[in-house]
Structure formats: structure tokens, C-alpha cells
Amino acid sequence: MTEPNAAPVHIATLASLAGRVGEVLATSPWVTIDQQRIDLFAQATGDHQWIHVDRERAAQGPFGTTIAHGFLTLSLLPELANAAMV
């Protein structure tokens, strides 16, 4: 596991960001995405696809369990960025 940043990297401009290609700019603490969070996201978005919410069917699928929605993962970016960079 990567430890969260001790001191965040300060990026003043987009131009200065280009010079840091390939560098780790920030890390955040791990975030656990449990089934309750997935189910709540499914309710909020109306996306009840089986791979996300049907544990029995998903157990027979390619991942052996349910998986988080891609948009759920994307929706965590503000939380993760805040934890890593502020």
C-alpha cells in the first residue's frame, strides 16, 4: 500500500504540470467501496445492472463478485484529490 502524501506537491500552473510527467504527484488513503455504497449509487443513478447489484449472478460472472460502477469510481475523484493534494 502506498502511504498518503506527507506534504502535497504544489502545482502553480498547467505549464508546470507538463514538466512532472511520470512523477507521482499525490497519493490518498485507501477508500473501501462496499456493497452498500454500490447499492446506494445504483439507487441514486437508476443503474441496477446485475454486475453491480446481483451478488448471486455476479458470483458466476467474470469477476466472481459484484463490481463498482465506473461512474461511482469517477465520483470519488473530488474526495480522493482533496485527501491527496490539500
Q: Language-model features: where?
A:
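Hot-dog-fold acyl-thioester-processing enzymes
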Residues: 2-86
